Every structure is written in structure tokens, then in C-alpha cells.
């Protein structure tokens, strides 16, 4: 949904193989050298599929092999500009799960490379965006072509698709 968050349960699982007699979960988590990784796409090749699924929530029924098709589309589909950012490793002597979640989430928001598509989605949803906040990167797609991707969607699906693209801008502005 464009609102990427660290799942605390996954971090807790990483601490399960510790020697419970000699190591605390916080010590183990601190030693793992977790590196926050942020991948920013100008275009999500699965945006329409995700929007349909998210718009209908629990009432959505997947077609046979839809997950496999989504994976293939995600790998092979056009993404436009892609930015991969490796953050600073989390290697404190002791690191609690809530602190790790907060550090990783903050790094993802700070290191996300906003694209013009993110700002176009905000505009389409009625958000006022300061000119100084806009992405400086050249777009590999025009604004009209980007918005046309959602022409065949229902209003609820279109809203969901635009929110997926707008969410990184909203998260970044909220963190300031």
C-alpha cells in the first residue's frame, strides 16, 4: 500500500536462535548488523493489481496463480527509475525490537528517493505540494501517461493506486 513498515515479529524471530542462558534478545539483535535497505521505484509494475486487491480488502478473491503472475510482473515489469539505498548498519551493543523497528522505519522514510510519480499522485488526490519538495529526477513517463495507467480502474481502485504512490511523500513530510 506504499506505507512500508518493519514487522516487529520478523525481528523477534531473528533473536530466537540465541543462547538463552548467556544472551538477551537485545544483545543478539544489536550484533546482527541489520542494514536498512530502501528500494524506490518510479513505477510499480504491479500497481493496478495491488490497487484492485487493496480496494476490496477481505472481499477480494484471487484468481488461480495470481500470486505467481504478480511476482513475475514485479520482476519483469517496467519500473522506470529505480534507486537502491543501503542505510547505516544497526550495530549497537544492545538493541530492543521497538528501537530497531523505529530506526529501520525512520531510515526507510529518510532514504526513499521520491519520484515525480509520487508527487503527481499527491496532486491527483488534492494534496498541495510545495515546489521545493518536488523530486528533481527526470521522469521516464509523462504525467498524463502515468495517470492513464488507472483509467480502467473503478474509483475505489484508482484512489487506492494513487494513495500507494502518494504515501511515501506523505510519510516523508510527516517525518519533518
Question: What residues fall within each predicted segment?
Answer:
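Membrane-interfacial terminal anchoring regions of lipid-handling membrane enzymes
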Residues: 1-176
